[in-house]
From Swiss-Prot:
Gene name of this polypeptide: rhmD
Function: Catalyzes the dehydration of L-rhamnonate to 2-keto-3-deoxy-L-rhamnonate (KDR).
Sequence positions that bind Mg(2+): 222, 248, 276
UniProt-listed CDD domains: MR_like_2
Reaction catalyzed: L-rhamnonate = 2-dehydro-3-deoxy-L-rhamnonate + H2O
Disulfide-bonded cysteines: none
Active site location: 325 (proton acceptor)
Name recorded for this polypeptide: L-rhamnonate dehydratase
Binding site for substrate: 29, 55, 345
Gene Ontology biological-process annotations: amino acid catabolic process; carbohydrate catabolic process
Subunit-structure text: Homooctamer; tetramer of dimers.
Record site feature (Increases basicity of active site His), residues: 298
Amino acid sequence: MTLPKIKHVRAWFIGGATAEKGAGGGDYHDQGGNHWIDDHIATPMSKYRDYEQSRQSFGINVLGTLIVEVEAENGQTGFAVSTAGEMGCFIVEKHLNRFIEGKCVSDIKLIHDQMLGATMYYSGSGGLVMNTISCVDLALWDLFGKVVGLPVYKLLGGAVRDEIQFYATGARPDLAKEMGFIGGKMPTHWGPHDGDAGIRKDAAMVADMREKCGPDFWLMLDCWMSQDVNYATKLAHACAPFNLKWIEECLPPQQYEGYRELKRNAPAGMMVTSGEHHGTLQSFRTLAETGIDIMQPDVGWCGGLTTLVEIAALAKSRGQLVVPHGSSVYSHHAVITFTNTPFSEFLMTSPDCSTLRPQFDPILLDEPVPVNGRIHKSVLDKPGFGVELNRDCHLKRPYSH
């Protein structure tokens, strides 16, 4: 089989600072009013009264969704979405295009390495540039799968299990249990600036959910980089009587010594997890060395599927789990091939967590959601990532080349 070359790469965006809030899509923080994801969740900005109540108040949704499409000489296309918006469009159209167009559709690792090397001087260890590279990488995998007529998970070597089981992230673990999920992860609402009173309030929330969900349903806390080691340690011990399964991302990404200390201090049997806001393989190697139990890369932010596969191998070599942050189909096709990912995350994007809504709604068509907390591998059997771009969304292409 002669594989075609890539003829075009294009980048669009939706949402972000120039749009009405609530666009959704790849920037899942960009939701409308009265949504749990924007309701007094503890953040690094919570210590400032003006930015305590709402994450959108400090601009969590200003980037918007980046959509990258790659087109082969034969007219077939692949695409992906991430969080990078208009600035990501500029990087794709004005810089990364030179490493993509003219390459064979199978040259994914070559393109990936060239994108990383060429942006190293302005990318740092993650953030906007890495989100953009991730989006390109995912689009390339989607195109390759569609050209050869295979789902991405089969390109990676095939499934190691028949289905993926999920826990749900949202404000209502009790509703998640009714929907068949294996656990529920709640955001914390208080931080170090709230003192011991904040610890008591979040521990009371866990206690209330434990009573509602029973003794065996998993309960976890997502702290979203909002704490310090002392506060996180005290919170973990306050929640231990309620069988908290893990405490997640308590500290900013680069506080590796803090994660090492927190793991030493955590109650016996309670896991410490992080990784959502780490980018690059090197940062995950350092994170793994802290001894945390689960690494949680976001495939749309860490360097794409190419990097996620490397992170999973790194974690496996150390006996650690890798459970990616959300990411819908882009994670599904990876984790069903990983032996060290026994479960995965589903992010509840309905406002009150009472219904199942696709994570990247409305930008993806045919995006699957779990049934009774699970997705069978047969659901993933369409070529590429198995979804299509919703071109009825108001796509903007601000740059070209």
